[in-house]
């Protein structure tokens, strides 16, 4: 694979060349040169790569995997993203926004912790694309000012995933 970095701090994602492969001007995007296709949106990319590699997406368990993957795409990511906007990037500009998204963020941590009480990973005991999609949001726990210590199961999950060689390599890209 080849990595092309898009500098979102310089608005490179809004350039016409990039918008042709990502109409919403969002990262990530992949191009599969073997099949001559490009894909945008994390969930679509993860499903595509998992099906292509036959890893992290057990077809017999895809219903539960999809449920947690889409939960991340529709709820966890957007809500933690809003928390980042109000709490990390623009503190002091909206007390309502900061308080609202802090509470939602805390609730997400609690909900994930409860789920992980009953299973090693989000979709039972297999590491899947649902975990891959959710992990980067929890990896920003220092931005959330909640702390992982009071969430025993979420902490275990986070520590397990953060010690994986491929995850370490991915964060170093």
Language-model-derived ranges and their functions:
Residues 68, 72-166, 170:
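GST-like fold's C-terminal all-alpha helical module
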Residues 5-8, 61, 128, 153, ...:
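Proline- and acidic/polar-enriched loop/turn elements at helix boundaries
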Residues 1-100, 106, 113:
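GST-like domain detector, emphasizing the conserved glutathione-binding G-site
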């Amino acid at each position: 694979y080849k990595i092309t970095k898009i500098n979102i701090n310089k608005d490179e994602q809004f350039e016409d060349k990039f918008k042709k492969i990502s109409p919403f001007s969002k990262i990530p995007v992949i191009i599969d040169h073997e099949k001559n296709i490009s894909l945008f949106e994390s969930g679509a990319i993860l499903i595509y790569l998992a099906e292509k590699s036959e890893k992290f997406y057990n077809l017999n368990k895809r219903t539960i995997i999809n449920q947690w993957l889409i939960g991340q795409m529709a709820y966890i990511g957007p809500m933690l993203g809003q928390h980042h906007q109000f709490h990390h990037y623009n503190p002091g500009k909206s007390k309502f926004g900061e308080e609202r998204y802090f509470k939602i963020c805390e609730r997400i941590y609690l909900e994930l912790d409860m789920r992980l009480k009953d299973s090693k990973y989000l979709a039972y005991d297999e590491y899947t694309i649902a975990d891959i999609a959710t992990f980067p949001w929890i990896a920003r726990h220092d931005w959330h000012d909640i702390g992982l210590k009071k969430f025993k199961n979420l902490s275990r999950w986070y520590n397990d995933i953060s010690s994986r060689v491929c995850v370490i390599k991915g964060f170093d890209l």
